[in-house]
Structure formats: C-alpha cells, structure tokens
Amino acid sequence: MSGDTCLCPASGAKPKLSGFKGGGLGNKYVQLNVGGSLYYTTVRALTRHDTMLKAMFSGRMEVLTDKEGWILIDRCGKHFGTILNYLRDDTITLPQNRQEIKELMAEAKYYLIQGLVNMCQSALQDKKDSYQPVCNIPIITSLKEEERLIESSTKPVVKLLYNRSNNKYSYTSNSDDHLLKNIELFDKLSLRFNGRVLFIKDVIGDEICCWSFYGQGRKLAEVCCTSIVYATEKKQTKVEFPEARIYEETLNVLLYETPRVPDNSLLEATSRSCSQASPSEDEETFELRDRVRRIHVKRYSTYDDRQLGHQSTHRD
C-alpha cells in the first residue's frame, strides 16, 4: 500500500541515523517515506534480492528515520511502487513511454537492482528497433472513412483535396506550379503542427485543389484554389496558391484544440430570458445570429470570392 502524502517532521525535530536491525523480522511491515511518497511493505520483500535496499534493511547500512519512525529515502517516489512490485514478483509491466522507462531505469540503477535495469534496457532497445513515425498522414479511400476520421478525431482537422483527374480543360501557365506549392505547404504544415492537428489527404474528391478545415467534428472553413477562366478562346482551369488565407484558417482551427464544455444550463437560462424578452430584443438577437451565420457562409467562398461549385445562401 502506498500514499502520496508528504510527511513533514514537527518543528525542532531532526531526523536521526540509526542501524536497522532487520534480521529475523520476515513479514514485519516497515514504513518508507521516499521523496514525500509514503509506502508500506515487508522487510522480506525488501531483502529478497541483493540490492542496496537489502543492505539498508539487513543492518549493513545506517538508515535515516524521523521521530514517527518513517524511514527516509532521499529519492523521487514516482516509480518506487513499481520497484517494490519487481522486488516482490521478479517481474513487472513496464511503462509504454520511453521517458518513463528511462526514469525507472535510473532509479533501478541507484538501488542496484540489476534485473530491473536489464529489463528497462531491453525495452528501450525494442522500442528503438520498432520505431514508429511521428507524423502520419492518412489518405482517405471513401467518404465514409473521411467522416469517421473527422468525427472521431480529438484534434482539429485540416484536409487537402487534390485530384488532377477532375480537370476537363487545359491549365493556365502557372497552375502546375501553384498546385505543387499547395502540396508543399500541406507537407510543411503537417510537420509543424502534427501533434496538434490531424492532417488528411484526399485524392478521390470532386475538386482539383481544395483545403477544408474542421474543428470539434464540424466544418469551419473551406479554401477552393481552382476556378475557370477565359484567358483564351477556350476555357482553362486556373489553380491559385492563397498562402496567407491557408495559414489564417490553419491558425483558426487551433482555437478548437480544447473541447467545449457542455453548456446546457446556459442554453436553458438564455431560452428562459428570450421567452421574456421584448420584441425589439428578439429582433436584435435574430439579427446577431443571422450575422454570424452569414460570416460562416461567406468563409466557404473561393479565394477570389467566386462561388464555384458552391451555392451561396444569405439573407437580405
């Protein structure tokens, strides 16, 4: 049994050195204060292996105790419970995190527990050999897969759709270069924000080059980079590179990293107040909601504000 209570000695009381006479105590419990974390265990568990703890509790080393009998060990107590489990059972389940394994190995080295040190070293080597990439970019294969990825993600989502097979016309002179720049910017952003944003590639959609931004499962904005122009007698597809707009929307989705707190009580309060509001207040509230809706709809326009492939809905 262990606790996390830090025991402070009484004013004027000083810890004292004493020899711990543990011979023949067997299953007697001792109380340990390891860096402020409190543990109870048996002398038998502490002396099963030839370690520094065995030297401490077999009388070969002096130990530091306070006036209440707690044996003080000046080490971090974070992993001491794991160390006790190893001393009792000769095996443990190691942490998954590499940093925590390193911390545990440092404590095992201090207490001279060679078996546990070997376990930690093997685990670290295995993790090194089976290294997983830090930045994974899913390529969606169906609309259902895309919906599931976005709905299940706890992070904001940035999706780049690029599909040259959707083009029916020839490209303008700079379109190939701009398409490549969009892809390069996507790669750059995914490396920069991979721990905070889920980046998705879509190569089966109906657009040629289009960015979509999601937060908390809903679509926030879209930047369509293509348009049809009449630069010559024939129609041509123009691909643009709205770099500043893409950066702006990417930074906007970072505002949705923290999940929203349910506000049912707030909704109830506002619904009650609205039912008692005057007609002028109702009109003002409707106007505010309408303004917000129009702002969001406007953000779905293309870079040059042409509604290519998207219907514009607004109120006059």
From Swiss-Prot:
GO terms for cellular component: Cul3-RING ubiquitin ligase complex; cytoplasm; endosome; nucleus. The keyword Protease does not apply. Pfam families: BTB_2. The modification Phosphoserine is found at S278, S280. Phosphorylation at Ser-280 by CK2 facilitates the nucleus localization and increases interaction with PCNA. Its main location: cytoplasm. InterPro entries: BACURD1-3 (IPR045068), BTB/POZ_dom (IPR000210), SKP1/BTB/POZ_sf (IPR011333), T1-type_BTB (IPR003131). One of its GO terms (biological process) is protein ubiquitination. The keyword Ion transport does not apply. This is BTB/POZ domain-containing adapter for CUL3-mediated RhoA degradation protein 2. It comes from Pongo abelii (Sumatran orangutan). The lineage of its organism: Eukaryota, Metazoa, Chordata, Craniata, Vertebrata. The gene is TNFAIP1.
